[in-house]
């Protein structure tokens, strides 16, 4: 008997199901009209370069002062219950401008959204998207575990400028549809999402338009006893439209995955679920096909790579202990490539906004904790066509997040988050190994431990105002055996600590510190053609350390309105080159207002 195709089965289910509205605005709360909101920010700083390096450096400016004023005015209109549009106009002025000199005006955001027939949601223009960690996803940035409150204002600037929502979403321009269907039998509900976006425009010559499209179909089963299943199919495709320019070749990247979350035990003391995701990727470079010329239907693309991945495990929740535990086995193939999931937040090839080059030789300063904490210039939300460079001192086990290719092993996690308790904590442990050796048959082993804790000290010490402690650490080791030339042994430790104390009504004292040490050696490959290893430029050897610490005051005028004045100092030291040790001191004031 010929099996029933899944598409036909889905179509039959959709036809049999009554449509249900998703997120339609409540009738009682609707008021047509125009609203205004936005953000205002004033930022002024002075930075000074010092340390041993400056004893001989006669070319680098020791002190830099700059700043800016930014006003983002959002104008939104809702003429009826089912339609809403919004535009954000940015006015920016660099401090030092005179009578309008240095002022720029630009449109930062435009979108429209609404509901069709009280059932289908749509959005056009700027939009934020996330599916799963292997399809469309924005991994967390390097050099951060649990940011101290002292560094939060600068982190908020980075997140705002790069459209980071905090939910691992990527910013795109395009269109999106969402709708849900309810069922009386077989399934409880089905949710459908489809999207199409342009992620790169054409220059009408050698750079073609690059598009991204895909979607998700998710289904939820009725609950039968303790058992209930949620499953979904995710698909994302990135392709170059070669008809939009004169380019002779372009890329294609297709990723499809299935995910499932099956609850097998529900109780007051214990709830257990089985979780899994698996799929495949296709990455290829194809030539333009001339419609007037004869083409070979069996012709192979210029480059084609395919691979698979899967992760499967168990998640257990202990409600009485406010504890959630999970353990998964992970296998991500060496040639697995998913551009919309593996593109990093930090682009190490970008220029730093402060002291990009230092020393008499004008060497480019390596990205450090100082830049990772505060510099929007090195961050991006763009989707790249290949694996981006990374720094093994900050993230070597999972530089591209959970979708990092060529990894097999275990990922364990625990979250302790009780209601009303002064302590919350989480920990992640990853024990991984390469699937395929790079430049040798020997395989690297990766061990990663990441832990964070938030402690409300006020109830513990009897303090009448806010008093909070934040802690974070990341310990990472990479090792490989074999001959001396093959051997790898790199260890990095990152520590974070911060203290926030309200000393007067809405006046906070902020203290924070971050420190990293790294020692050992590794081989960092040069990547070409999606994720192919082209070469190893030589061993990456390091024995260095850096620290960033500071203190400041913050006055909260109201919710999302504050002024902070801070003093910070950053130091970098390498045992192999002590004459190049340097430090950067920074004093800044930041006023931020959301309205």
Predicted regions and their residues:
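C-terminal beta-signal and adjacent terminal beta-strands/loops
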Residues: 558-580, 595
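Bacterial N-terminal signal peptides
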Residues: 7-17
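Blade-level signature of beta-propeller repeat domains, shared across WD40, Kelch, NHL, RCC1
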Residues: 589-592
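Hydrophobic or amphipathic alpha-helical targeting/insertion segments
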Residues: 106-153, 159-164, 168-171
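Surface-exposed strand-loop-strand hairpins of Gram-negative outer-membrane beta-barrel proteins
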Residues: 30-32, 43-68
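Histidine-anchored nucleotide/phosphate-binding helix
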Residues: 71-75
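Positively charged n-region of N-terminal signal peptides that target proteins for export
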Residues: 1-5
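Signature for the C-terminal beta-barrel architecture of outer-membrane proteins
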Residues: 23-33, 62-66, 80-102, 119, ...
């Amino acid at each position: 008997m010929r099996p029933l195709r899944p598409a036909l089965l889905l179509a039959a289910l959709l036809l049999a199901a009554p449509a249900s509205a998703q997120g339609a605005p409540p009738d009682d709360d609707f008021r047509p009209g125009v609203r205004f909101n936005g953000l205002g920010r004033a930022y002024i700083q002075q930075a000074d370069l010092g340390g041993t390096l400056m004893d001989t450096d006669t070319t680098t400016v020791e002190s830099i002062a700059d700043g800016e004023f930014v006003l983002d005015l959002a104008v939104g209109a809702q003429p009826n219950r089912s339609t809403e549009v919004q535009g954000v106009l940015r006015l920016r002025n660099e401090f030092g401008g005179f009578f309008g000199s240095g002022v720029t005006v630009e449109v930062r955001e435009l979108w429209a959204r609404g509901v069709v027939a009280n059932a289908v949601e749509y959005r056009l223009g700027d939009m934020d998207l996330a599916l799963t960690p292997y399809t469309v996803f924005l991994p967390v940035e390097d050099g951060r575990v649990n940011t101290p409150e002292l560094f939060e204002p600068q982190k908020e600037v980075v997140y705002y400028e790069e459209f980071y929502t905090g939910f691992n979403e990527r910013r795109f321009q395009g269109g999106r549809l969402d709708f849900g269907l309810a069922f009386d039998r077989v399934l409880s509900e089905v949710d459908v999402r489809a999207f199409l976006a342009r992620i790169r425009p054409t220059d009408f010559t050698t750079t073609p338009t690059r598009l991204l499209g895909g979607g998700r179909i998710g289904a939820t089963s009725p609950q039968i006893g303790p058992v209930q299943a949620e499953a979904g199919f995710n698909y994302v495709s990135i392709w170059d439209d070669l008809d939009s320019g004169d380019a002779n070749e372009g890329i294609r990247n297709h990723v499809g995955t299935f995910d499932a979350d099956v609850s097998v035990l529900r109780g007051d003391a214990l709830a257990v679920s089985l979780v899994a995701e698996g799929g495949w990727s296709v990455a290829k470079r194809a030539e333009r096909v001339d419609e007037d010329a004869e083409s070979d239907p069996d012709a192979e693309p210029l480059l084609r790579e395919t691979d698979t991945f899967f992760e499967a495990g168990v998640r257990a929740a202990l409600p009485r202990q406010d504890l959630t535990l999970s353990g998964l086995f992970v296998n991500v193939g060496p040639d697995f490539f998913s551009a919309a999931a593996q593109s990093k937040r930090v682009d190490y090839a970008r220029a730093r906004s402060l002291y990009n080059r230092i020393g008499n030789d004008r060497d480019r300063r390596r990205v450090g904790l100082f830049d990772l904490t505060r510099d929007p210039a090195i961050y991006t939300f763009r989707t790249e066509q290949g694996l981006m460079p990374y720094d093994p001192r900050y993230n070597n086990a999972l530089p591209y997040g959970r979708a990092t290719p060529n990894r097999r092993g275990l990922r364990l996690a625990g979250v302790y988050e009780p209601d009303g308790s002064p302590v919350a904590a989480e920990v992640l442990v990853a024990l991984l190994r390469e699937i395929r050796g790079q430049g040798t048959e020997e395989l690297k082993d990766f061990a990663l431990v990441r832990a964070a804790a938030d402690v409300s000290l006020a109830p513990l010490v009897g303090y009448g105002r806010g008093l909070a402690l934040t802690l974070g650490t990341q310990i990472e080791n990479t090792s490989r055996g074999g001959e001396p030339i093959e051997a790898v042994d790199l260890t990095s430790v990152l520590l974070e600590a911060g203290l926030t104390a309200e000393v007067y009504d809405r006046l906070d004292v902020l203290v924070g510190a971050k420190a990293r040490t790294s020692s050992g050696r590794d081989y960092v490959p040069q990547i070409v053609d999606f994720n192919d290893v082209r070469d190893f430029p030589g061993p990456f050897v390091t024995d260095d350390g850096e620290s960033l610490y500071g203190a400041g005051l913050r006055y909260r005028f109201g919710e999302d309105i504050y002024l902070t004045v801070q003093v910070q100092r950053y130091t970098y030291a390498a045992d192999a080159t002590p004459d190049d040790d340097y430090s950067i001191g920074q004093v800044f004031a930041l006023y931020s207002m959301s309205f």
